[in-house]
Amino acid sequence: MSKGFLVSLEGPEGAGKTSVLEALLPILEEKGVEVLTTREPGGVLIGEKIREVILDPSHTQMDAKTELLLYIASRRQHLVEKVLPALEAGKLVIMDRFIDSSVAYQGFGRGLDIEAIDWLNQFATDGLKPDLTLYFDIEVEEGLARIAANSDREVNRLDLEGLDLHKKVRQGYLSLLDKEGNRIVKIDASLPLEQVVETTNAVLFDGMGLAK
């Protein structure tokens, strides 16, 4: 790649994005692709501290706008400190969540103004958007059941939210898919992990213009 390529992974809770990413890394490395993987919120020291505040299960009184602004603050620091330098160095950057999460969770899920969220995303990223977004779709009940069955996963504040919020979040993602289908590719995350990885690999390499 002559320049960097930015990929974001999106989806409702329990979609398995992290597991897919872990399985993809050896494939990418075997192809000689220089890749940086990172996550939101977090990715850098300041971002990880903000992540702790956002996801702390005891912070049940957090206001929706406070939550949004914390995500935006983490996003800005993460981009400046880690993501942009990697893109400038010509690397493939894969982000576990990015701008679409704010629209889905705080816009559709929390009911905040989507235009305001779009403006904040634009402000924080200077207009940067992913070259490709992989949306891992799964029924809300199945995703939450996966989380409940995973004893190794630490429960966070969003896991404790009611079913209604998670359904709104999924609808938000599906709305984004309709609106930005040229950038966002839907992947059926209910399939066995091996099949999801195979599909993701094909979509990713096609998007990057590389042979599988």
Swiss-Prot record:
GO terms for biological process: dTDP biosynthetic process; dTTP biosynthetic process; dUDP biosynthetic process. It comes from the Bacteria. Disulfide bonds: none annotated. It catalyses: dTMP + ATP = dTDP + ADP. Keywords: ATP-binding, Kinase, Nucleotide biosynthesis, Nucleotide-binding, Transferase. It is an enzyme of class 2 (transferase). ATP binds at G11, P12, E13, G14, A15, G16, K17, T18. This is Thymidylate kinase. It comes from Streptococcus pneumoniae (strain ATCC BAA-255 / R6). The lineage of its organism: Bacteria, Bacillati, Bacillota, Bacilli, Lactobacillales.
